[in-house]
Design a protein with these regions (language model features):
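Subset of outer-membrane beta-barrel
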Residues: 19-307
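Sec-dependent signal peptide recognition
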Residues: 2-9
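Hydrophobic h-region of N-terminal signal peptides that target proteins for export
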Residues: 10-18
Length: 307
């Protein structure tokens, strides 16, 4: 079984990593945007660290290791040009039956004027452009250290009136807990699915293969310094390297930082998190800031509820 799994993984890696770089050849670019402030603060190097409802985006297999019954996540990204990117998700641990999850991601623009060559100042009409993702996930523990999971997604893209398209995608992931110094490994095939057509051009989904690892650099009591590294190979560009660090103080205050290697614009990232109890319920809130060189910076904030 292990040999067969390694063979399949090797074939997938070969197929994905051997693809030519084709910038501008894929649609639904909003699927590439980090949804979690904690993850974004670590430059997105989060596949082996992700837990709870946020893991539905980074590594659905991870929800099989949830310690709580329910986890709710609400995050928002202040993207460029006034664009908002929202993420809401729920994860449920059903014990021996496995873990289930559902997510909703949307990217919407501000209201824009309809302009034509004859009426460059506007026709009096307005419109919005939006992209949406709805996903259902399932994950299960195969052993006490190995998890497998997957997500089926429905993608809807609305640019303007008749320029609307739908697609379905599949994501599969696996994670392995070494059990020593917090070391974990994870991998994922993301956004594998149907293509969409706008006017006369066909665009594929932004399929990618991700691999990551993490572990504790320092641990003394409840104070931990964690480091992570990841590599992402998209089907429309060169490999991207990610690295992140997190300092946890008494599992209450979290300081994070990260850096992107090989990305055309993204560079450093930083953020902070706070975990606390309110009305007997455990909660956490996070904030991050990411630099995109000449484009400027983006910020994210989010809240997690644990039941």
């Amino acid at each position: 079984m292990l040999k067969k799994s390694l063979l399949i993984t090797g074939l997938i890696n070969t197929l994905i990593f051997s693809q030519y770089e084709r910038p501008g050849s894929t649609a639904a670019q909003f699927l590439k945007i980090d949804v979690s402030p904690a993850a974004a603060a670590m430059a997105g190097s989060y596949i082996s660290i992700a837990t709870g409802a946020d893991a539905l985006y980074y590594n659905p297999a991870a929800i099989a290791s949830m310690s709580q019954k329910f986890n709710l996540s609400f995050n928002q990204t202040n993207w460029f040009a006034g664009i908002k990117h929202d993420y809401s998700a729920i994860a449920f641990n059903a014990g021996r039956a496995g873990s289930f999850g559902a997510l909703l991601t949307r990217l919407v623009t501000d209201e824009m004027k309809v302009r034509t060559p004859m009426q460059p100042d506007g026709t009096g009409e307005t419109f919005y452009a939006g992209s949406y993702r709805i996903g259902l996930a399932y994950a299960r523990k195969m052993t006490d250290r190995v998890n497998f999971g997957g997500t089926i997604n429905y993608i809807f893209i609305s640019l303007f009136r008749e320029f609307k398209q739908e697609a379905t995608t599949l994501e599969l992931s696996a994670s392995y807990d070494v059990g020593v110094r917090g070391m974990k490994f994870a991998m994922k095939i993301g956004n594998f699915g149907s293509s969409v057509k706008f006017v006369n051009e066909i665009y594929e989904m932004p399929t990618n293969f991700s691999f990551g690892f993490s572990g504790n650099l320092f641990s003394r009591g409840a104070n931990i310094v964690l480091a992570s590294g990841s590599i992402i190979k998209p089907n429309d560009g060169p490999p991207i390297g990610l690295t992140g660090f997190e300092y946890s103080m008494n599992q209450m205050v979290f300081l994070r930082g990260g850096y992107n290697f090989g990305h055309s614009t993204a560079t450093w990232s930083t953020g902070v998190g706070l975990k606390f109890k309110l009305a007997g319920r455990q909660m956490s809130t996070d904030y991050s800031m990411n630099d995109f060189s000449a484009l400027g910076t983006t910020s994210r904030y989010g809240i997690n509820l644990h039941f």
